């Protein structure tokens, strides 16, 4: 029976596959995933072979089919192409951007010889090895963990993919893997080596698409990190792709983090292992800003002044200005006003009501602690923050911006947004001047994102340093849990909030924006599978499951106007 190739063309905006006949001279070289050149509308374009079918399955008569012109390169393995099909449905996406992530960035005429070390086989022992043998799960580690035990246990099962949140982190893990004696390929730079066969393939989020012969295990490092999710549409998350790929391949998946997300915990169930260093965090000090008379107008508290005046300490001060919550507090007792449903900071649209920007719950302006009906906005006075710090410290303070390249050698106190944690290489103390801006932000993952920020600070000071957290909500379960070394109360509370609001991982969420958002929202509102809340320029779509959400989005007729669909939006 004559075979045809169903090709996904490498053309922006085109997702419909086209059928082409396979000439005899290409029959042996052309496989699912191959990069090919095909004719399309009187020109020749590149594409990927999505599937190979009998000619009788084509809607076009064989005599009318055009031929594949040539095979240009090795492409993603067939199992990766199938994974791309799943991901395109899951994130309401075209396949092209996903296939690009899974393909080499240059022509690869053929795979090379495999390079496996003798160290990649042999049974290892311990709780992590036992977890891997039973299908994988979550490994909770310490902030400064080098993940040697995880790497050794995973690679001992056979070829392994290791996904890290950043290229720099991936490079460190690759160096560690080579030090342990394993053959290692960095993805995507060493795509050919990865596809030919090595002990371990390491890379940032795109490594989850690596073609790996005889895949035996997938490890995701720092699964909590937002960098593992693509910001542009499709907003796929490497953690979720890794879990699905492991399921399809019947191999273990290991999600590693000092602060595992609810999504990871929900997937793993009771398959959670804590390493010996899991509780080895630096000293954590919670500073209650409301006990200071200047609490509403200044971030320079008395404990902070004491730290700054110790000139032997290198201090980093963090204030995330972008996207911060404008908090309200009781004018009488200073209690921060929070939503009774989801815990976010509320705002005051009029004299009689406060409203939650996260879940839209509304209630009268009454303090939940003392009954007062007067609120005040907490202003942080950031315009002269550096000058205030410098005056308090009696030594130079350098402001760090994302564009800052060189540090002032005379400075030992630094202040900036989150970028300061990446520009300064070491510190004795990291001070979060106003963690409430993250902790109470109108995003359902606010507490997880605040934990991520605190973790970056913990890694900067390591075990011998100190983490100082200034807050107006000192009894928040995230802060009390961190101080006590036990986040179980926070996890329980967060599970309850998300279950009530049908938020991931107990439901599915998408954000529709752009000029055509109203049209798409109107179509979705007619579906029994989803709930739609339309705002000024965007719509939030909720469903009981990812399958229900995907089915509803797939049934929408896309309007001509621009529409962006972000499934599982990172900042909703």
Give, region by region, the residue ranges found by the protein language model.
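C-terminal helicase module of SF1/SF2 nucleic-acid helicases/translocases
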Residues: 32-37, 302-306, 310-313, 388, ...
């Amino acid at each position: 029976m004559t075979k045809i190739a169903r090709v996904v063309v490498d053309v922006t905006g085109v997702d419909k596959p086209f059928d082409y006949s396979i000439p005899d001279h290409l029959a042996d070289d052309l496989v699912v995933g191959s990069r090919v050149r095909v004719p399309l509308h009187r020109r020749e374009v590149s594409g990927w072979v999505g599937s190979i079918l009998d000619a009788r399955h084509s809607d076009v008569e064989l005599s009318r089919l055009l031929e594949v012109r040539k095979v240009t390169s090795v492409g993603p393995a067939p199992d990766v192409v199938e994974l791309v099909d799943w991901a395109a449905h899951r994130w309401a996406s075209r396949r092209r951007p996903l296939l690009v992530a899974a393909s080499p960035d240059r022509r690869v005429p053929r795979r090379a010889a495999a390079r496996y070390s003798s160290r990649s086989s042999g049974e290892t022992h311990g709780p992590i090895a036992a977890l891997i043998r039973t299908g994988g799960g979550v490994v909770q580690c310490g902030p400064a963990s080098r993940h040697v035990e995880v790497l050794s246990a995973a690679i001992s099962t056979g070829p392994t993919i290791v996904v890290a949140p950043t290229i720099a982190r991936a490079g460190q893990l690759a160096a560690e893997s080579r030090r342990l004696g394993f053959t290692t390929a960095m993805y995507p730079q060493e795509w050919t080596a990865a596809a030919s066969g090595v002990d371990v393939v390491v890379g940032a989020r795109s490594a989850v698409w690596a073609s790996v012969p005889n895949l035996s295990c997938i490890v995701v490092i720092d699964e909590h990190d937002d960098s593992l999710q693509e910001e542009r549409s499709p907003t796929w998350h490497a953690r979720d792709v890794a879990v699905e790929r492991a399921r399809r391949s019947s191999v273990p998946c290991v999600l590693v983090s000092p602060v595992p997300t609810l999504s990871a915990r929900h997937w793993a169930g009771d398959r959670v292992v804590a390493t010996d260093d899991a509780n080895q965090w630096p000293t954590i000090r919670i500073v209650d800003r409301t006990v200071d008379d200047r609490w509403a107008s200044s971030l320079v508290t008395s404990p902070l002044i004491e730290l700054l005046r110790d000139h032997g300490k290198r201090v980093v001060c963090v204030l995330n200005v972008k996207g911060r919550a404008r908090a309200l507090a009781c004018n009488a007792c200073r209690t921060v006003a929070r939503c009774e449903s989801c815990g976010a900071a509320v705002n005051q649209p009029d004299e009689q009501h406060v409203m939650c920007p996260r879940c839209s719950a509304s209630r009268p302006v009454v303090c939940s602690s003392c009954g007062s009906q007067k609120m005040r906005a907490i202003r942080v006075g950031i315009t002269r923050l550096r000058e205030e710090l410098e005056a308090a410290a009696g030594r130079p303070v350098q402001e760090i911006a994302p564009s800052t390249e060189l540090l002032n050698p005379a400075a030992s106190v630094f202040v900036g947004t989150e970028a300061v944690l990446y520009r300064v290489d070491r510190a004795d103390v990291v001070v979060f001047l106003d963690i409430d801006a993250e902790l109470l932000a109108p995003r359902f993952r606010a507490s997880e994102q605040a934990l991520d920020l605190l973790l970056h600070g913990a890694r900067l000071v390591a075990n011998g340093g100190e983490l100082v957290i200034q807050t107006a909500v000192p009894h928040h379960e995230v802060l009390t849990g961190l101080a006590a070394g036990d986040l179980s109360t926070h996890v329980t509370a967060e599970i309850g909030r998300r279950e009530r609001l049908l938020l991931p991982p107990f439901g599915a969420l998408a954000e529709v924006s752009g000029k055509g958002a109203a049209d798409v929202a109107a179509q979705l509102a007619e579906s029994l599978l989803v709930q739609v809340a339309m705002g000024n320029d965007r719509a939030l779509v909720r469903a009981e499951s990812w399958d229900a959400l995907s089915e509803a989005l797939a049934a929408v007729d896309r309007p001509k106007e621009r529409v962006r669909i972000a499934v599982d939006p990172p900042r909703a």
